[in-house]
Amino acid sequence: IRLSLVGSEMCIRDRYKEGEKIAIKVNLNDNGGSNIIDATPQSVYALLHQLVDIMNVPQHCITVYDAQRRGISAIYTYLQPVYPDVVYQNWGGFVPDVIRYSSEITDPGAMSLARAAYEADYMINMALMKRHSRPTDNWKDSAGQTGITATGKNQFGSIGNVPPLHLSIRDWSKFRGMGTYNSIVDLMAHERLGGNTLVYIVDAMYVNPIHNGRAVRFKRAPFNDGWTSSFLASNDQVAIESVVLDFIRSEMPVAANADNFMHEAANIGNPPSGIRYEGRAQKSLGVHEHWNNPDDRMYSRNLKTGKGIELYRVPLDAERPAIEYFYSDRISKIEDQPVTLYWKTSNGEEVLLNGEVVAANGSCVVKPETSLMYELAVKKGGTVQAVQKLVVRSFTDVRCYDVKEAQTEGSAIVEAEGFAEFRGEKGSSKGALTWQIGVPATGEYYLLFSYSGGSQVPSYLYLNDQLVSENI
């Protein structure tokens, strides 16, 4: 993935001053339990590469967060070794009494804002592309949610208590249709959220048909029954929502009021609902319109009939040097266990692994004595055109305990039926959380427990090099 924020790069360079904080709001809806609908690590890596390595933003000034979810491991495991000083934050950490809603919502938790957003000088909204709910008359079938999730709904992950907002975004067809209040508009207009955002990015590498579903292929051109494999980027939050909706609606039905909040936001000074929004002084939060048809995908600026949206497809040079993949078969080396690196590149004149020339496609076994970063670079015309980094962690101080000793320490209990139970003091309303992990009855196990951050979040539990759980 080569993510270059052309216009936004200029914007950041012109405005950014050393020491200012940047918050990156990602979507980690799956809580780290699987990779069904989480932000893709490669996409966040590409963004951090731009900010840190190209724009020279200090790592400690960047926070990647989703304050409503516990799934930060979806990206932490891959990115923290490469960018260790970036702050990776998930559940918790809210500032009270920050957000005012224009109608219906008075819950104190809903008025609290994630500290990462509150303290940031700039926001980058990095959302996913997905239909949130199927059209239905039964709110239970739709999980009581909105039509699509993109940059607007993404900010629900910045709010302390989300359920009070759900009523205003639901489509019960006959209950709440067009021209009604929508709390997403209040978030889009808020000075610490929409008002503080440099760029809106939609990670459309994959598209999901429902809030907890698996990715689906798109049938129409240019996807041609393939993965969407795309990014959308804009400085206009209403425009990017409009385009996301058009793409999704061209492949699957959406809720009847899916674009209600877009109409409200585009006309926030005089919305169809008649609601006096808190941000009404802004008159409009952006441009809302729909394309002419799903085959040509032309908006008013494309058609030269108005000054609305222009959908511009950034051309990619098919001959550009690229890293197709670069990964290791395990994230850490324990004692003498070998680790294998794999890579595939294209269109380069020279490929370097930590400065040494290697084949364009290949693999190698490494046994670093200490944790070590590996950098794969592809050169053409004497300059590096593509680069990717990964870190292999090395653990040599491995201590062995039998079951009885482990039970005495209280760190693990291996039960007769082959379950390992780990307990922590963080996670549930009662202050305790229990995991049960199926393990073979015999064998050798390595337990890696790591902790990061100034509070109890996040912490991670690994069993045999596999993430077991987090937030202990």
Regions found by a protein language model. Name each.
Residues E319-S328:
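Proline-enriched interdomain boundary motifs that mark the N-terminal boundary
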Residues T383-R393:
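Edge beta-strands of extracellular beta-sandwich domains
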Residues F395-I472:
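Extracytoplasmic
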Residues R330-Q337:
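Short, solvent-exposed loop/linker segments at the N-terminal edge
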Residues V358-Y374:
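Solvent-exposed segments in extracellular or luminal domains encompassing
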Residues R2, S8-S34, D38-A318:
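Extended, low-polarity segments enriched in aliphatic/aromatic residues
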Residues G355-A360, G427:
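Short beta-strand segments within Ig-like beta-sandwich modules, predominantly Fibronectin type-III
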